[in-house]
Amino acid sequence: MEQKQTTEPRDSPPLLVLLDPAAEQLEVSAPHTPLSPQPQSARAAPGSAVRFFCDSAREEEAGEDEPLLKKPGPMSPRAVRKGRTRLSSSSDDRENMSSGHVENGEYNVILNDPEFADIIHRAEQAIESGVFPERISQGSSGSYFVKDPKGKIIGVFKPKSEEPYGHLNPKWTKYFHKICCPCCFGRGCLVPNQGYLSEAGAYLVDEKLGLGVVPKTKAVWLVSETFNYSAIDRAKSRGKKYALEKVPKVGKKFHRIGLPPKVGSFQLFVDGYKEADYWLRKFETDPLPENTRKQLQSPFEKLVILDYVIRNTDRGNDNWLIRYDSQDDDELSEKGDSFPLKDWKEIKEPIIKIAAIDNGLAFPFKHPDEWRAYPFHWAWLPQAKVPFSQETRDLILPRISDMNFIQDLCEDLYELFKTDKGFDKDTFEKQMSVMRGQILNLTQALKDGKTPIQLVQMPRVVVERSYSGSQGRIVQMSNAFTQTFHCRKPFFSSW
């Protein structure tokens, strides 16, 4: 894509802009040099990173669709409130943005979320100073603990290219799975290699429903030597560095010298939590006091609602977390296993929290109907036999009973999912049809006072858009959607 020449040097750094869900549109303009033939505006994708390059930048990687736009300049308070920013070639850009930069000169510019901006900035500073992300040994994909300059873990980054079925997955589990058992390889109900969008989408749903069980998660771009790169990428990086060192005039023409950044989901790290399975085993041997049990029930119901709405196909008791906090005694977190459960009765007003992590295998485009059912493992817990509380019903029912709220949710997910270069609109509509069916069942279950286990036993429904119906902004179930039941069951069914 060609652009008019500007006064910026050829080695000006490209930019990454993370758009807040509240942002509606990003205006791009230069005070002296118009951008041509680039579009002058782009709709903000909730929770995703948009990459911006200065006019002199040129694409190097085949298959990358990256907008080449000018560097952001100062933002007025009014522009921030509206979720907009103007891009210019001001020399004070770095001082006027909440941003950081990685080794190759690329920047994350985060709008309307100073807390998350600071965390990303510290992560990039750490990478620059040699504190690299550490690969997590558990799991079947490449995921990394991201640290700040002091070495403290602040987030978990999961690159798209290193997902379980990604071409750069550093772990061999899925490779052997593909070779030894190809008939069961992958999950036929999921869009392949879009787990990072599923992670960010789960947080978006959690935020829209007011659940508060998913740690803040957004799609960003990061680069680190510890990520798994192909031999070609590493060789190209070494070659560019050598060219810059030996022939500076040639080296300066490259807009990227180091390794290429990777897009992926960045989830804030939660402190003090342990795997749910750890606590659940203790609850079996020594049940919680009644007040504490009720405190656990409320976030548990929110976890159920999240998983059911997004149809999480990978929810075991080892990938959601529980944190137990005592206001009177901090010894519980220090002693760990040595703290006897019988002493819990002496602790006043304990607080129990739940964190729903590992949401990368959700948003299927059809209900599981092949080999496996991918059940929710929480369905066999005692908490799943308790009817949804009035508090949960009052929180969720007013929202999901409104089809316009559901339409807004689908539109936000559309803006997020379409940022992936493999996005297919028809497949996305199928994903939303499944989600709308899940919401329809959830609405009925909450109205009838059912339990979580009764919820998952309800007939599976798909609510498809009726293109002959109303296409206006106000949506009604009767004239815009059609409801069908999905009767085919997987070979190995759990219920």
Curated annotation (Swiss-Prot):
Region (Disordered): 1-101
Region (Important for interaction with membranes): 171-184, 274-282, 371-380
Keyword Transport found: no
Membrane topology: Peripheral membrane protein
Region feature (Activation loop): 356-376
Top-rank lineage group of the source organism: Eukaryota
Principal subcellular localization: cytoplasm
Region Catalytic loop, annotated ranges: 311-319
Ranges for region G-loop: 136-142
EC number(s) per entry: 2.7.1.67
MF terms (GO), sorted A to Z: 1-phosphatidylinositol 4-kinase activity; ATP binding
Bias type Basic and acidic residues, positions: 1-11
Biological process according to GO: endosome organization; Golgi organization; phosphatidylinositol phosphate biosynthetic process
CC terms in the record's Gene Ontology section: cytosol; early endosome membrane; endoplasmic reticulum membrane; endosome; Golgi membrane; lysosomal membrane; plasma membrane; trans-Golgi network
Catalytic activity line of the entry: a 1,2-diacyl-sn-glycero-3-phospho-(1D-myo-inositol) + ATP = a 1,2-diacyl-sn-glycero-3-phospho-(1D-myo-inositol 4-phosphate) + ADP + H(+)
Keywords, alphabetical: ATP-binding, Cell membrane, Cytoplasm, Endoplasmic reticulum, Endosome, Golgi apparatus, Kinase, Lipid metabolism, Membrane, Nucleotide-binding, Transferase
Keyword Cytoplasm: yes
Compartments, as annotated in UniProt: Cytoplasm, Cytosol; Golgi apparatus membrane; Endoplasmic reticulum membrane; Cell membrane
PI3K/PI4K catalytic domain: residues covered: 130-465
Location of region: Important for substrate binding: 163-165
Protein residues bound to ATP: S143, K158, Q267, L268, F269, V270, R281, K282, D358
Family: Belongs to the PI3/PI4-kinase family. Type II PI4K subfamily.
PANTHER family, sorted: PHOSPHATIDYLINOSITOL 4-KINASE TYPE 2-BETA (PTHR12865:SF6), PHOSPHATIDYLINOSITOL 4-KINASE TYPE-II (PTHR12865)
Function in brief: Contributes to the overall PI4-kinase activity of the cell. This contribution may be especially significant in plasma membrane, endosomal and Golgi compartments. The phosphorylation of phosphatidylinositol (PI) to PI4P is the first committed step in the generation of phosphatidylinositol 4,5-bisphosphate (PIP2), a precursor of the second messenger inositol 1,4,5-trisphosphate (InsP3).
Name assigned to this protein: Phosphatidylinositol 4-kinase type 2-beta
Organism, as annotated: Xenopus laevis
Gene label: pi4k2b
